[in-house]
Amino acid sequence: MTLQTDDFAPAPARRVVSAAPASPQEQAIERALRPKLLQEYVGQVKAREQLEIFIGAARQRGEALDHVLLFGPPGLGKTTLSHIIAAELGVNLRQTSGPVLEKPKDLAALLTNLENRDVLFIDEIHRLSPVVEEILYPALEDYQIDIMIGEGPAARSIKLDLQPFTLVGATTRAGMLTNPLRDRFGIVARLEFYSAQELARIVKRSAGLLGVPMDDAGGLEIARRSRGTPRIANRLLRRVRDYTQVKADGHITKDIAERALAMLDVDPEGLDVMDRKLLEAVIHRFDGGPVGLDNIAASIGEETGTIEDVIEPYLIQQGFLQRTPRGRIATQAAFRHLGIAAAPGAQAPGLFAV
């Protein structure tokens, strides 16, 4: 007899279409596929053009680039851009994240070790603690930090000069940044979801680096189901590569991509089992809505935070779900996609339709 307690409950399976940060093994693969320079970077045309100008000007003057804030959904290339910025400037990159910097001394140790014009990348910068953020303000404005020496009545503050540097902050939740911190970034770039055509170019480049022969149609099929996100596109490419290696001749065609992605339960709109489960619950159990988030969570056995932060955003962006003051409503597009008699009220087509 097998006994199982909550302490040893299996972790939930990772969704193949999740844009969440990758596992360590996947991060290593991502680094190998990452473009190194702006000319290799696909998509984000506006942000790329702005950075080309600002980086070029800073390089010509021999100055540190203004501090850069990159924000947008996960998996769109914020970390990649931070590496590219450092490479284009020809300087070192130091990388950390907001939750890691628990105390002022953690940040001070990083800042005092930066060389002239170096880049400091802080991921999840919205999660900096207030006390650490206070230390950062004078560092960003004046390249100085105040640190406390000693304790009690003998404690005193000393000012340390820093080398001019560039902070690149990345966040998926720009609204959670405090106004004082946001105002200290001279360059702000929003990263948008990619079109299927842009993702097809990324998939083609990645396939070449992985040594996988692939038709353009096969690459486009992977791109169409990648939810506008390069991280997902590269993950699906690797899974399709595995499929064709075992089930076919190693060459990715449109037919092979379709069969592999069907096996992974990723449909032509990029929806997986969990997406469809949510839509079906709203339609079948709650007559299409409106229905509250707590009721949806109870009906599909997921936490409200997971639904709100992980599942819902893509369904809303694609026009399958509508968030209203009275609750969630399944749109006509959702009824059509699931092959159910459509409810009244047409919605706009999805963002990534080809």
Curated annotation (Swiss-Prot):
InterPro entries on file: AAA+_ATPase (IPR003593), AAA_lid_4 (IPR041445), DNA_helicase_Holl-junc_RuvB (IPR004605), P-loop_NTPase (IPR027417), RuvB-like_N (IPR008824), RuvB_C (IPR008823), WH-like_DNA-bd_sf (IPR036388), WH_DNA-bd_sf (IPR036390)
GO biological process, any: DNA recombination
EC number(s) on file: 3.6.4.-
Binding site residues for ATP: 33-34, 75, 78-80, 141-143, 184, 194, 231
Gene3D superfamilies on file: 1.10.8.60, P-loop containing nucleotide triphosphate hydrolases (3.40.50.300), Winged helix-like DNA-binding domain superfamily/Winged helix DNA-binding domain (1.10.10.10)
Domain of life, source organism: Bacteria
Biased composition, class Low complexity, residue ranges: 9-22
Region Small ATPAse domain (RuvB-S): start-end pairs: 195-265
Subcellular location: Cytoplasm
Primary location: cytoplasm
Keywords: ATP-binding, Cytoplasm, DNA damage, DNA recombination, DNA repair, DNA-binding, Hydrolase, Nucleotide-binding
Binding residues for DNA: 323, 328
Metal-binding found in the keyword field: no
Residue ranges of the region described as Disordered: 1-22
This protein's domain notes: Has 3 domains, the large (RuvB-L) and small ATPase (RuvB-S) domains and the C-terminal head (RuvB-H) domain. The head domain binds DNA, while the ATPase domains jointly bind ATP, ADP or are empty depending on the state of the subunit in the translocation cycle. During a single DNA translocation step the structure of each domain remains the same, but their relative positions change.
PANTHER family: HOLLIDAY JUNCTION BRANCH MIGRATION COMPLEX SUBUNIT RUVB, PTHR42848
Family: Belongs to the RuvB family.
Protein name per Swiss-Prot or TrEMBL: Holliday junction branch migration complex subunit RuvB
Lineage of the species this protein comes from: Bacteria, Pseudomonadati, Pseudomonadota, Betaproteobacteria, Burkholderiales
This protein's encoding gene: ruvB
